[in-house]
Swiss-Prot record:
One of its GO terms (cellular component) is cytosol. This is Chorismate synthase. It comes from Escherichia coli (strain UTI89 / UPEC). It catalyses: 5-O-(1-carboxyvinyl)-3-phosphoshikimate = chorismate + phosphate. Belongs to the chorismate synthase family.
Amino acid sequence: MAGNTIGQLFRVTTFGESHGLALGCIVDGVPPGIPLTEADLQHDLDRRRPGTSRYTTQRREPDQVKILSGVFEGVTTGTSIGLLIENTDQRSQDYSAIKDVFRPGHADYTYEQKYGLRDYRGGGRSSARETAMRVAAGAIAKKYLAEKFGIEIRGCLTQMGDIPLEIKDWSQVEQNPFFCPDPDKIDALDELMRALKKEGDSIGAKVTVVASGVPAGLGEPVFDRLDADIAHALMSINAVKGVEIGDGFDVVALRGSQNRDEITKDGFQSNHAGGILGGISSGQKIIAHMALKPTSSITVPGRTINRFGEEVEMITKGRHDPCVGIRAVPIAEAMLAIVLMDHLLRQRAQNADVKTDIPRW
């Protein structure tokens, strides 16, 4: 299982399972001399952690991160940073009934086909519990980007089911349990979630993440284009089934005269490209969207098979999110931060001396 690392110069490797003793990660490539404490990481972990509202799973994990290495006297040393979060609220007995049954829509079937066995407790390595370490590592990247380059990364929920959410007020995102930027839609979201809970069903969502202050020039054509790496990072998040950069699939209905981001002496006049042209950042806001499927961990009966090939009826027990998109917001922010920090370090390594007279806005 070699796919546990992301990044080239800023590298994040995670380990751990949903019901194991702990989750952890190794973060390589952090420059020395950056002030860093566990409190710097805890804020985003608290935004992601389970059991914080009635709309998410009631598994209660404090997600208290420990810095094991790479920090001395409050600053980074330039060596590998080891991070650890202990699992404290596992209820593995909830999953004993699915030991030999493949939950439809989950990774049970594919993991067993690949490895010949699987950790059925909460999905094991395939669980979104793993993303806690991505958020911890991403918090390091967010701190570096903000303090060294003035880059701000923000995410929000922009659709739940058939309810579109307009980005009206970023300040509202942290004031409600949905990460919703549209205060007029909070009641509708609450009503939908109550209905889903009553029905024992789930719903999909769309999350948008925006990076402001990104300098022009990030991205490594042709295979490590910035948008390609962002798409790769976001698609690696559990339940994500689609990623768009800028206008994404909406460009299909546009003409070239509409879609091109014209430039005047005052700067770009639009941002259909989402801040990336030719795989390289343009200096505009980087905008990405991701679509998350509705979780299959529901109490609505469904058909599946067991490992003996027998058809059985499946009802998933345990503690699950009726809409996984809610807690995906800080995860999306973290993954975008990881990619941007990696590309900033790569740009600095190759092109630190490049100077141009081309205007920047």
